């Protein structure tokens, strides 16, 4: 088997959608026994005068809009661990937290996808 190069791996990642990348990350966590809560982020050596950019955000569904069915499907897509009934309850109980500890870039993509469905999302 040929060795996978860094460049070919990155190119493969670029061709994946968000769901596939999330599945890959979860598989890597399981394969290598990575516990995200055990990761320590190094702080700056200075006195902390600079404002740090958020590295993880929370996505909240504020309003599902007029057509809830596609919103429920999108909730299931980004949170495959939820059953159809749980996703429906989450959408019906808006405002409700959709996802925690999401990278800001991924959160913006998710927000855009929900906005296209007529739902209102906030990123905190």
UniProtKB/Swiss-Prot annotation:
Q: Does the keyword Ribonucleoprotein apply?
A: yes
- Any GO molecular function: mRNA binding
Keyword Transcription regulation attached? no
GO BP annotations of the record are: translation
Keywords assigned:
Ribonucleoprotein, Ribosomal protein
Q: Which family does it belong to?
A: Belongs to the bacterial ribosomal protein bL12 family.
Q: How does it assemble?
A: Homodimer. Part of the ribosomal stalk of the 50S ribosomal subunit. Forms a multimeric L10(L12)X complex, where L10 forms an elongated spine to which 2 to 4 L12 dimers bind in a sequential fashion. Binds GTP-bound translation factors.
PANTHER family (UniProt xref) = 39S RIBOSOMAL PROTEIN L12, LARGE RIBOSOMAL SUBUNIT PROTEIN BL12M
Q: What is this protein called?
A: Large ribosomal subunit protein bL12
Source organism of this protein record: Mycoplasma mobile (strain ATCC 43663 / 163K / NCTC 11711) (Mesomycoplasma mobile)
């Amino acid at each position: 088997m040929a060795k996978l190069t860094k460049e070919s791996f990155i190119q493969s990642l670029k061709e994946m959608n968000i769901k596939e990348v999330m599945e890959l990350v979860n598989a890597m966590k399981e394969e290598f026994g990575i516990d995200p809560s055990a990761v320590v982020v190094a702080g700056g050596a200075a006195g902390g005068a600079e404002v740090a950019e958020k590295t993880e955000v929370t996505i909240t569904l504020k309003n599902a809009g007029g057509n809830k069915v596609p919103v429920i499907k999108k909730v299931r897509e980004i949170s495959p661990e939820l059953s159809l009934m749980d996703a429906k309850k989450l959408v019906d109980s808006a405002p409700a937290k959709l996802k925690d500890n999401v990278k800001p870039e991924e959160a913006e993509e998710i927000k855009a996808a929900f906005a296209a469905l007529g739902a209102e999302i906030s990123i905190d």
